[in-house]
């Protein structure tokens, strides 16, 4: 419960530093390094000047209040009673409003008393960078937002492109992300922008790569501190598209996406789930590898990011040490074990197919030491993965 010591997982900044090959001492165990802040360690604490412990006589008089007269005292009591009556009416109205609110299905249980659920944010209270006081509200909002922004099955409406072309493009974009050393968030947002645009616009075969690099340009501007320039994308496409072409496509994609790139990402939900499960670096990295495999596969585009994140962590935990999907994980992920098993099975089939797949960018990427060579572990060819794959 609250008293249980919990391993605090890496923050977004530390995780990205680790992915870029920049070491952070003891990232996942014991003490963690401080997180990056834009304006150093600034707090709202105001330090008052000390007067050597002495208070001047004239200052004491300034703090004294005059005794109220009977007339003013009666007026104060009357005002207080009126305020209390108004506040009581507001409280009753708030309770009535709360009773009328329908909770979403995936919100599960909102209290910790019904199940053995740990409050994973308790230790973060008082740390302004972790937003522990309203982190639960943030994730409830993200759950609603992902349902509104998830792309539909758009490929049947496309006349010149198909599943294979999309997979080739995404596989190449993953290589570009590694080449430019971009954040993981940038990669996921790139694919979401790509799919959202294709969901609304028919694209010619000759312009598909243009749409892909423009999506990465937009995602870089949204996520990166120092985004690549348009000229970098002209170079990476071997001058297939001019700067002007990319600018024109950028305007077109901005309008199609309604200037809204606030997509909740799989990574956001995975970090929350990993904290709830108190998982180590190996399980967390394996879950990231499994999630990234789904980017290439068109079948997963209609899945909610939260569902993909939950399924990836569940499969990772089963592959490494057969860990249980605890009530705490059910509560914070929003998914029971039975709810995610169909997605886990599809993910298992996809993982087993990687040996014969033409799309090796993710597998090669996670074979590097900074990703713990996770794509080479023997569990990815073991009987546990086959058992889940056979459920389909």
Curated annotation (Swiss-Prot):
<keyword id="KW-0498">Mitosis</keyword>
<dbReference type="Pfam" id="PF00134">
    <property type="entry name" value="Cyclin_N"/>
</dbReference>
<comment type="function">
    <text>Essential for the control of the cell cycle at the G2/M (mitosis) transition. Interacts with the CDC2 protein kinase to form MPF. G2/M cyclins accumulate steadily during G2 and are abruptly destroyed at mitosis.</text>
</comment>
<dbReference type="Pfam" id="PF02984">
    <property type="entry name" value="Cyclin_C"/>
</dbReference>
<protein>
    <recommendedName>
        <fullName>G2/mitotic-specific cyclin-B</fullName>
    </recommendedName>
</protein>
<dbReference type="GO" id="GO:0051301">
    <property type="term" value="P:cell division"/>
</dbReference>
<keyword id="KW-0195">Cyclin</keyword>
<dbReference type="GO" id="GO:0044772">
    <property type="term" value="P:mitotic cell cycle phase transition"/>
</dbReference>
<dbReference type="InterPro" id="IPR036915">
    <property type="entry name" value="Cyclin-like_sf"/>
</dbReference>
<dbReference type="InterPro" id="IPR013763">
    <property type="entry name" value="Cyclin-like_dom"/>
</dbReference>
<keyword id="KW-0131">Cell cycle</keyword>
<dbReference type="InterPro" id="IPR004367">
    <property type="entry name" value="Cyclin_C-dom"/>
</dbReference>
<keyword id="KW-0132">Cell division</keyword>
<dbReference type="GO" id="GO:0016538">
    <property type="term" value="F:cyclin-dependent protein serine/threonine kinase regulator activity"/>
</dbReference>
<dbReference type="InterPro" id="IPR046965">
    <property type="entry name" value="Cyclin_A/B-like"/>
</dbReference>
<comment type="similarity">
    <text>Belongs to the cyclin family. Cyclin AB subfamily.</text>
</comment>
<dbReference type="InterPro" id="IPR039361">
    <property type="entry name" value="Cyclin"/>
</dbReference>
<dbReference type="InterPro" id="IPR048258">
    <property type="entry name" value="Cyclins_cyclin-box"/>
</dbReference>
<dbReference type="InterPro" id="IPR006671">
    <property type="entry name" value="Cyclin_N"/>
</dbReference>
């Amino acid at each position: 419960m609250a008293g249980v010591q919990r391993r605090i997982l890496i923050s977004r900044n530390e995780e990205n530093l680790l992915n870029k090959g920049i070491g952070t001492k003891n990232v996942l165990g014991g003490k963690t390094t401080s997180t990056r802040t834009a304006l150093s360690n600034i707090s709202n604490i105001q330090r008052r000047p000390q007067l050597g412990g002495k208070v001047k006589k004239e200052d004491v008089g300034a703090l004294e209040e005059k005794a109220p007269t009977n007339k003013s005292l009666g007026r104060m009591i009357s005002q207080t009673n009126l305020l209390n009556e108004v506040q009581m009416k507001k409280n009753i109205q708030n309770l009535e409003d709360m009773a009328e609110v329908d909770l979403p299905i995936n919100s599960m249980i909102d209290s910790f008393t019904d199940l053995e659920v740990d409050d994973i944010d308790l230790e973060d209270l008082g740390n302004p960078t972790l937003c522990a006081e309203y982190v639960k509200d943030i994730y409830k909002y993200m759950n609603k937002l992902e349902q509104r922004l998830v792309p539909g099955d758009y490929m049947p409406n496309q006349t010149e492109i198909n599943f294979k072309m999309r997979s080739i493009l995404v596989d190449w974009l993953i290589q570009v992300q590694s080449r430019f050393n971009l954040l993981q968030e940038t990669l996921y947002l790139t694919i979401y922008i790509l799919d959202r645009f294709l969901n609304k616009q028919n694209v010619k075969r000759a312009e598909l790569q243009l749409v892909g690099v423009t999506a990465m340009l937009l995602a870089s501007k949204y996520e990166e501190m120092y985004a690549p320039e348009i000229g970098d994308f002209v170079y990476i496409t071997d001058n297939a598209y001019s700067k002007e072409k990319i600018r024109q496509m950028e305007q077109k994609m901005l309008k199609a996406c309604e200037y809204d790139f606030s997509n909740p990402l799989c990574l956001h939900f995975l970090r929350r789930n990993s904290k709830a499960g108190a998982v180590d670096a190996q399980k967390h990295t394996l879950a990231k590898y499994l999630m990234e495999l789904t980017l290439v596969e068109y079948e997963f585009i209609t899945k909610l990011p939260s569902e993909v994140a939950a399924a990836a962590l569940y499969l990772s935990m089963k592959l490494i040490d057969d860990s249980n999907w605890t009530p705490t994980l059910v509560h914070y992920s929003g998914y029971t074990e039975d709810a995610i098993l169909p997605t886990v099975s599809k993910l298992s089939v996809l993982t087993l197919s990687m040996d014969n797949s033409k799309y090796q960018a993710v597998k090669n990427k996670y074979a590097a030491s900074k990703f713990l060579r996770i794509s080479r572990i023997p569990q990815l060819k073991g009987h546990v993965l086959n058992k889940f794959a056979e459920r389909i």
